[in-house]
Amino acid sequence: MGSAKSAMLILLVAMVIASCATAIDMSVVSYDDNNRLHSVFDAEASLIFESWMVKHGKVYGSVAEKERRLTIFEDNLRFINNRNAENLSYRLGLTGFADLSLHEYKEVCHGADPRPPRNHVFMTSSDRYKTSADDVLPKSVDWRNEGAVTEVKDQGHCRSCWAFSTVGAVEGLNKIVTGELVTLSEQDLINCNKENNGCGGGKLETAYEFIMKNGGLGTDNDYPYKAVNGVCDGRLKENNKNVMIDGYENLPANDESALMKAVAHQPVTAVIDSSSREFQLYESGVFDGSCGTNLNHGVVVVGYGTENGRDYWLVKNSRGITWGEAGYMKMARNIANPRGLCGIAMRASYPLKNSFSTDKSSIA
């Protein structure tokens, strides 16, 4: 009898482990006929959490902190499964933010200041990409296919999205104009662009102005990313090729057609509202979920297209490759709101570069 009970216990444990193995894709746990989680949820969630910790290199300072994170993780896991059961055009998953509450996620990720700079020294408004009846634009654009997009980067716990979005647009334009894709330095902006606040956040327009006034941007190899505020060291740019721009312009506000035309010509920076739980846990598909227009996060729009009949913007984030579709989001395009989903058409801008140019001077 004892051996039979032991065998039964082993069988039950094996069933739990097997069910967890199918859930290790970090996206879904099975439901019963009433869409209620099975009674094994807690056991599965704990094992999934351990695997998730390994995948994302998570280590907590105490048992109490780990238990607190597990509680948040379980709540996010339930939310993911409930939303994914609704057969949406996108799916949620256990991103690197799955152990954070929504409030904590906002504190970590939002670094774009939507307020206009007090002194637009170089900024000009432009109708360069205003659409007309004669325009014939490609049905889809993906600047990755043209070699104009560097690898997805991760800003870490530094609120430096403003730097990553600016740098991404400059990297793309530099490739288009010069034929050379150069990975540029966000740390250069964080340390040296004193009119912004480094890991405390910043304005994209101010970053463009800094690049113009201070001899361009250094490369990531010369000035690598540290994810913390540092002292500006001009020597890191001395005698090295720095990528320059000639100016920048803002797109007409609340005009997705103008944004589309601009993206057909070059990658474009945009400030969006990324403060929803769905955005925090986005995994794949065309996102048309909950978000407002409280602009707080800088991204790069590197293309557009249509998937399963749904138009989308191809957005490069700076949260590493474990968020979204290997670091990218397909965000619904051509929605009823002229501001665009998450305000993507409200505050878009792009750099200008007329020719190949470098500067070997340092900055103070």
From Swiss-Prot:
GO terms for biological process: proteolysis. Its EC number is 3.4.22.-. Glycans are attached at N87. SMART domains: Inhibitor_I29, Pept_C1. The active site is at C161, H297, N317. GO terms for molecular function: cysteine-type peptidase activity. Residues 24-136 form a propeptide. Pfam families: Inhibitor_I29, Peptidase_C1. Residues 1-23 form the signal peptide. Keywords: Disulfide bond, Glycoprotein, Hydrolase, Protease, Signal, Thiol protease, Zymogen. Expressed in inflorescences. The keyword Lipoprotein does not apply. Disulfide bonds join C158-C199, C192-C232, C291-C342. Belongs to the peptidase C1 family. Probable thiol protease. This is Probable cysteine protease RDL4. The gene is RDL4.
